C-alpha cells in the first residue's frame, strides 16, 4: 500500500470531519455559499471569462493572491524580492551578479539545493532544469497584475517542480491606457518602466519595456537589466473563443562583488574581496507562448498553451580565496504544452458538480559546461554535459458540492520522465532512472461552519527527481523519485462586510529519499550534481490577518513557524539524524499598513523578518541569517494621472547577511543598507 494511505491520522480525521459535519449543521442553518481558503490582499484585475482551469479558489490549501497595487510601485533589485510581501515565503538573497535571489516556502530553502516551487508566468512553466526561477526577473513590478501563491501538495495541475506548491505571475492584459515611471535612488540606481494597452473591437495588445541600471550597494556590484514583453490577443465577437501570442525577452549583465568571510562582512560589508575582481555574469532569457481558450458548449470549456523557453547564463565566479575561479555556462531550451478541459453539467444529485482533466508535456535540451579559469581565461575543463529531459503528465479532478456548505475536490495526477545524458568529456551516455509511472493522489475538503467561518483540510502527494545528471542512471542501482506526502488543516475567517479576513493552518510534509544539489564551490571535477539527504519531515503553522476597515486603511500581518528535520539520514552522514536542514529559519513574518491620509497623500509602512538558520546538516557551525527590516513609503498625487513617490528601505540600516556552507567552504553576502528611492510616475 502506498505510504500516502498511511498519512497521519489527524489529516484523515480532518477530511472526514468535513465530510460528516453537514448532518447537524444543515438542519439548524439556512443554506449558504460554499467557503474557500483563499486570502486576497490588494486589487486584482478581473480575468477573461474564457480563462479556464483550476482557479486558485478551488485549491483548498494556503492560497494567497496579492494584487498588483501592492507590487507595482515597489523598488527591488530582483523580482523575487516582491515575494517578501507574501505570507510564509522565504527569500534567499544571494546578491551576486545575475543571481539576485530565490524564494521558497514550506520548510524548503531558496539556496538552490532543492527548488521546490513551480513558477508560471501567464500560465507558462518558468523553472529551469534544476527548478530555479531565472525567468522571474524578466517580469518587472509595473507589469504585474497579481501574484497567486499556492502552498501545499494537493493541487493536481502541476507535477515537476511543484514539490511544495506553485506561484503564478499574472501580467496586465487589455485596456486602453498607458503607464510609465522613472526612478532614481541610492547606490546609483536608475530605472525606467513603461507599458501600453490597446483594445479595439476583438483585438487587444499590450506592450512593456523596462531598463534598470545600478552601481550596487557593494564595490564591484554594477548591474544593467533590460526587459521587453508583448501580448497580442483576439476574442471572437460571440465570445466563444480567444487566441493570442505572448513574448518576452530579458537581458542582464552584472559584476559580482564576491562572498566575504564573517569578520569582513561585519566590519566592511560594502567591500569586495580582491579575489572577486574578475567575477561577473550575464544572462539572456526568451519566452514565447501561443494561447487558445474556447467555450465548446454551454457546459464545456478548454484551454491550451504552447510555449518555448530559452535560458542562457554565463558566470565567472570564485567563491573563496582558497578556491579557484570557474566559468559556468548554461544553455537550455524548453518546448512544451498544457491543455485542460472542464465540464460543468447540471445535476440533480448534488448542489453542483464539475469535472476537469488536463495533459501537459515538456522537452528540455540543456548543455552545462564548467572550466577552471584565471582572469576569465580558461585553463582546464571541469564539465561538458549535454542532456535532454522530457516529462509528460495528466490529471483529473472533480469539484463536488454535495450540500450548500460542503465542497470536496478529489484529484489524481500521473507523470512520466525520460531522457538521455551525455558526458561529452568521456563519451559516456546514460538514460534517466526508471522512475515508471509517478502516481500522486490528492484530496481536499472545505466546510462552511458559519457565514464568516470555513474549515478546510487537504492531503496530497508531490514528487522530486534529481537535477543535472542527478536524474540519470550513472550507477548500477536504480533510484525512484522522492515522494513528498503532505497534509494541512486550517480555518478561514471573514469579518462583517468583508472588512477583515484571517486564516490559521497547520501543515506537514514527509519526503522519502530526498536529494539536494551540490554547489561544487571548490572547482574540482565533480561526478555528481546531487547528494542524498534521506527521509525528512517538514512541519509548521501559519497565522494571517488582513484588515481593510474602510477605503482609507489597509493592514496585513502574517507569521509562520517551520521546522525541517532529517529523520533517517543518508548512510554516509549518520551524524545528521534528527538534525535540521540547512538555511531554513524557524520563523517568517511580514506586516504592513497603507493609509490614504488625504485625497492626495498616501503613507505606507511595511517590513519583514526571519529567524536564524543552521548552514549545514550536522548543525555544529552555528546559526546565521536572521533579520528584521522596516520600510517607509509616501506618495503624492500631482493630478492629471501624475504621482511622485518616495521609499525608504531598511529604515534602521540593519546589518544582515546571507550565509552558505558547502564542501568545507563558507561565505557571506551582506544585504543592502539604508536606501532612498524617488519615483515619478504618470498615466494616460
Question: Where are the regions that the model predicts?
Answer:
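Short, acidic, small-residue-rich periplasmic hinge/interaction motif at the N-terminus
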Residues: 27-72, 293-295
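Extracytoplasmic beta-strand/coil segments of soluble accessory domains associated
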Residues: 47-55, 60, 80-124, 128
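Short acidic/polar hinge/loop motifs at secondary-structure boundaries
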Residues: 124-151, 169-171
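Transmembrane beta-barrel wall of Gram-negative outer-membrane proteins
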Residues: 186-213, 218-257, 280-297, 301, ...
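Membrane-embedded beta-barrel scaffold of Gram-negative outer-membrane proteins
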Residues: 291, 301-317, 448, 454-460, ...
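Gram-negative outer-membrane beta-barrel transporters
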Residues: 341-343, 404-408, 416, 508-510, ...
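Structural signature of Gram-negative outer-membrane beta-barrels, strongest in the C-terminal barrel
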Residues: 344-362, 382-511, 548-550, 560, ...
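C-terminal beta-signal and adjacent terminal beta-strands/loops
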Residues: 609-616, 635-684
Amino acid at each position: 500500500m502506498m505510504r500516502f494511505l498511511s498519512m497521519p491520522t489527524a489529516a484523515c480525521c480532518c477530511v472526514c470531519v468535513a465530510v460528516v459535519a453537514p448532518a447537524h449543521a444543515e438542519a439548524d442553518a439556512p443554506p449558504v455559499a460554499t467557503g474557500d481558503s483563499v486570502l486576497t490582499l490588494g486589487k486584482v484585475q478581473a480575468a477573461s471569462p474564457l480563462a479556464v482551469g483550476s482557479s486558485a479558489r478551488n485549491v483548498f490549501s494556503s492560497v494567497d493572491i496579492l494584487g498588483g497595487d501592492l507590487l507595482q510601485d515597489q523598488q527591488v533589485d530582483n523580482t523575487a524580492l516582491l515575494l517578501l510581501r507574501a505570507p510564509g515565503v522565504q527569500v534567499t538573497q544571494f546578491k551576486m551578479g545575475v543571481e539576485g535571489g530565490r524564494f521558497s516556502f514550506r520548510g524548503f530553502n531558496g539556496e538552490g539545493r532543492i527548488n521546490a516551487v513551480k513558477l508560471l508566468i501567464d500560465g507558462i512553466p518558468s523553472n529551469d532544469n534544476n527548478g530555479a526561477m531565472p525567468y522571474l526577473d524578466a517580469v518587472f513590478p509595473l507589469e504585474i497584475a497579481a501574484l497567486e501563491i499556492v502552498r501545499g501538495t494537493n493541487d493536481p495541475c502541476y507535477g515537476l517542480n511543484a514539490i511544495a506548491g506553485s506561484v503564478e505571475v499574472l501580467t496586465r492584459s487589455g485596456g486602453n491606457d498607458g503607464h510609465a515611471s522613472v526612478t532614481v535612488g541610492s547606490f546609483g540606481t536608475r530605472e525606467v518602466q513603461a507599458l501600453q494597452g490597446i483594445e479595439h473591437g476583438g483585438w487587444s495588445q499590450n506592450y512593456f519595456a523596462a531598463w534598470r541600471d545600478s552601481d550596487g550597494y557593494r564595490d564591484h556590484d554594477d548591474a544593467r537589466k533590460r526587459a521587453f514583453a508583448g501580448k497580442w490577443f483576439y476574442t471572437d465577437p460571440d465570445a466563444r473563443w480567444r487566441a493570442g501570442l505572448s513574448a518576452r525577452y530579458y537581458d542582464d549583465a552584472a559584476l559580482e562583488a564576491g562572498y566575504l568571510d564573517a569578520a569582513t562582512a561585519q566590519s566592511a560589508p560594502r567591500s569586495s574581496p580582491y579575489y572577486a575582481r574578475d567575477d561577473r555574469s550575464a544572462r539572456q532569457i526568451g519566452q514565447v507562448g501561443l494561447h487558445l481558450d474556447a467555450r465548446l458548449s454551454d457546459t464545456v470549456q478548454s484551454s491550451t498553451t504552447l510555449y518555448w523557453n530559452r535560458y542562457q547564463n554565463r558566470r565567472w565566479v570564485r567563491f573563496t580565496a582558497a578556491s579557484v575561479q570557474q566559468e559556468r555556462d548554461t544553455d537550455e531550451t524548453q518546448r512544451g504544452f498544457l491543455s485542460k478541459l472542464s465540464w460543468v453539467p447540471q445535476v440533480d444529485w448534488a448542489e453542483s458538480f464539475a469535472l476537469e482533466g488536463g495533459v501537459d508535456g515538456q522537452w528540455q535540451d540543456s548543455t552545462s559546461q564548467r572550466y577552471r579559469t584565471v582572469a576569465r581565461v580558461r585553463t582546464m575543463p571541469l564539465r561538458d554535459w549535454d542532456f535532454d529531459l522530457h516529462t509528460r503528465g495528466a490529471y483529473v479532478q472533480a469539484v463536488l458540492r454535495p450540500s450548500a456548505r460542503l465542497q470536496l475536490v478529489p484529484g489524481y495526477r500521473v507523470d512520466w520522465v525520460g531522457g538521455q545524458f551525455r558526458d561529452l568529456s568521456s563519451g559516456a551516455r546514460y538514460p534517466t532512472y526508471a522512475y515508471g509511472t509517478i502516481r500522486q493522489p490528492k484530496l481536499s475538503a472545505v466546510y462552511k461552519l458559519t457565514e464568516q467561518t470555513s474549515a478546510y483540510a487537504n492531503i496530497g502527494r508531490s514528487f522530486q527527481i534529481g537535477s543535472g545528471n542527478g536524474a540519470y542512471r550513472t550507477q548500477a542501482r536504480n533510484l525512484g523519485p522522492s515522494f513528498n506526502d503532505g497534509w494541512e488543516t486550517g480555518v478561514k475567517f471573514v469579518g462583517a462586510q468583508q472588512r477583515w479576513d484571517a486564516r490559521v493552518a497547520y501543515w506537514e510534509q514527509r519526503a522519502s529519499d530526498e536529494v539536494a544539489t551540490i554547489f561544487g564551490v571548490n572547482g574540482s571535477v565533480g561526478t555528481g550534481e546531487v547528494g542524498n539527504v534521506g527521509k525528512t519531515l517538514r512541519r509548521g503553522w501559519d497565522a494571517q490577518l488582513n484588515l481593510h476597515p474602510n477605503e482609507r486603511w489597509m493592514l496585513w500581518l502574517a507569521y509562520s513557524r517551520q521546522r525541517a528535520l532529517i529523520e533517517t539520514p543518508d548512510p554516509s552522514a549518520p551524524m545528521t539524524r534528527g538534525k535540521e536542514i540547512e538555511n531554513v529559519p524557524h520563523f517568517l513574518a511580514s506586516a504592513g499598513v497603507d493609509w490614504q491620509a488625504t485625497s492626495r497623500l498616501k503613507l505606507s509602512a511595511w517590513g519583514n523578518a526571519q529567524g536564524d538558520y543552521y548552514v549545514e546538516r550536522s548543525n555544529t557551525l552555528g546559526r546565521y541569517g536572521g533579520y528584521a527590516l522596516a520600510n517607509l513609503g509616501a506618495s503624492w498625487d500631482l493630478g492629471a494621472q501624475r504621482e511622485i513617490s518616495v521609499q525608504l528601505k531598511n529604515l534602521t540600516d540593519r546589518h544582515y547577511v546571507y550565509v552558505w556552507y558547502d564542501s568545507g567552504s563558507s561565505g557571506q553576502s551582506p544585504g543592502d543598507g539604508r536606501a532612498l528611492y524617488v519615483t515619478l510616475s504618470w498615466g494616460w
